[in-house]
């Protein structure tokens, strides 16, 4: 009997220990698996040492980038990342920078954003500015495309523009290309190239406005807030032009980032812009863009532009 009990104790006790060890290892495996999956998820987001910022080109892109310095300084402080500027040559170059993951944060035109987002859903809008009322600009987070001609010229009606020279801005522009080719062509009942004698691209809304004033083009499609920029620099006035057509309200320029950046970085980028109204050093920047505050935006806010793009693409 003693031998039997010894036999039982000798072999039964290790089995109990083994069972406990199996349970412990199972728990550890599950725990490590969970932690591993969390680490894997964290590893999939991007956490670069520096962030590259870009804007769509204007007449004075270098000077405008300098005006963004209080913004980028704040972004650098909040994110803990060095902020680098990318100097664009066209609307398309900013998009290519985003698609290639060279650019992390950017200011796009609405049409440019829709094009970029259709190619890569990770390019995500998060904010825009709410404009103050100006010479031609209305108050709020929207603007209009406007067809202007020089006051005192013979071009005082849409019909008078037949066979004349019209200025567009850039193929990626909303008010300077998309709206004219989709919304305005409904007014004239034909393509721009059939109605006008010549269609030219000037490169920016500011250059289009100046080209009208100087008589280099007979008319031009410009953004209302960009026209105001030229007026504020003393290169034009509202009294110097005829307004021949206005588009529907267009959502303002989208501020975007690549949503593959880590969540904490994206949150700090959003905070950079949404909180600008409370930053004294940003007043000059807000005054320059004629805004009191930034407002949050999402992809659906630009569905109007998507509909216009679809209509344009269907005609090509």
What are these regions (language model features)?
Residues 43-54, 59-70, 250, 256-257, ...:
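An extracytoplasmic/periplasmic, membrane-proximal ligand-sensing/linker region
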Residues 1-18:
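N-terminal secretory signal peptides that target proteins for export/translocation
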Residues 48, 53-77, 88, 111, ...:
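Bilobed "Venus flytrap"/periplasmic-binding protein-like clamshell domains
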Residues 107-121, 180-186, 211-214, 218-238:
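A ligand-binding cleft/hinge motif common to bilobed small-molecule-binding domains
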Residues 123-140, 195-198, 231-249:
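Short beta-strand->loop
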């Amino acid at each position: 009997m003693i031998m039997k009990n010894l036999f039982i104790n000798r072999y039964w006790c290790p089995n109990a220990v083994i069972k406990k060890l199996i349970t412990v290892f199972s728990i550890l495996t599950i725990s490590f698996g969970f932690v591993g999956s969390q680490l894997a998820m964290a590893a999939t987001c991007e956490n670069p040492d520096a962030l590259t910022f870009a804007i769509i080109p204007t007449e004075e892109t270098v000077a405008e980038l300098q005006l963004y310095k209080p913004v980028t300084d704040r972004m650098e402080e909040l994110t803990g990342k060095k902020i680098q500027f990318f100097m664009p040559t066209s609307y398309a170059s900013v998009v290519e920078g985003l698609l290639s993951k060279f650019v992390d944060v950017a200011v796009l035109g609405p049409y440019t954003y829709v094009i970029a987002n259709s190619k890569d859903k990770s390019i995500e809008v998060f904010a825009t500015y709410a404009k103050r009322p100006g010479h031609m600009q209305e108050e709020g987070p929207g603007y209009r495309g406007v067809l202007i001609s020089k006051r005192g010229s013979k071009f005082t009606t849409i019909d008078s523009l037949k066979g004349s020279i019209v200025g567009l801005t850039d193929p990626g522009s909303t008010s300077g290309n998309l709206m004219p080719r989709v919304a305005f062509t409904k007014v004239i009942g034909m393509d721009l190239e059939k109605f006008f004698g010549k269609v030219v691209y000037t490169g920016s809304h500011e250059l289009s406005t100046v080209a009208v004033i100087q008589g280099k083009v007979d008319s031009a499609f410009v953004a209302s807030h960009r026209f105001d920029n030229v007026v504020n620099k003393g290169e034009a006035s509202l009294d110097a032009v005829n307004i021949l057509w206005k588009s529907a309200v267009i959502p303002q320029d989208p501020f975007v980032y690549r949503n593959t950046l880590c969540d904490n970085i994206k949150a700090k980028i959003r905070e950079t812009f949404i909180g600008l109204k409370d930053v004294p050093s940003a007043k000059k920047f807000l005054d320059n863009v004629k805004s009191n505050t930034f407002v949050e935006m999402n992809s659906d806010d630009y569905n109007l532009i998507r509909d216009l793009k679809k209509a344009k693409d269907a005609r090509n």
